[in-house]
Amino acid sequence: IFLTLAGSTSAGGCMNLYSDLIKYNMVDAIVATGASIIDMDFFEALGFKHYQGSQFQDDTELRKNYIDRIYDTYIDEEELQACDQTICDVANSLEPKAYTSREFIKELGKFLKNNAKKKGSLIETAFDNNVPIFCPAFTDSSAGFGLVMHQEQNPNKHITIDSIRELRELTEIKVKSKQSGLLM
């Protein structure tokens, strides 16, 4: 069973449910957006918070106060930058080569095992239970900024995200399965 995630489900309070699905062996793999995995789950595992706001707030005013808005959810820009820096730091610690998002997210899970301020994130739970998380649009999130910083700091030896190899991995899982399903 593939669990698919999109949108602000962490800020909406659904990540505990998703973690339980992993703990009780009800999903075999996760396919998620970068926003769900990085901007929501990883961000909160670092000890940062999201705040309920309004989708009608003036973005210019929010920006003046260093507040980012994802529809009706607010994030402190300085905390988001700290999340970006952590992504960069994890990338800097890895062997320079191509990784799928699944492989990189597994490294984030390993990082969270020792460094999470909020235990029990989806990434950490998936890591603990050997459930792969795929994120086909991985850089369409705060992770993209962290990886740009990593590549700027390491122009000749850096990691990359190999989305083609990832698509092949996902396809192979589906082809090898006698039965499969999606939980959306």
Regions found by a protein language model. Name each.
Residues 1-5, 10-183:
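Conserved catalytic alpha/beta core of Sir2/sirtuin-type deacylases, generalized to analogous enzyme cores
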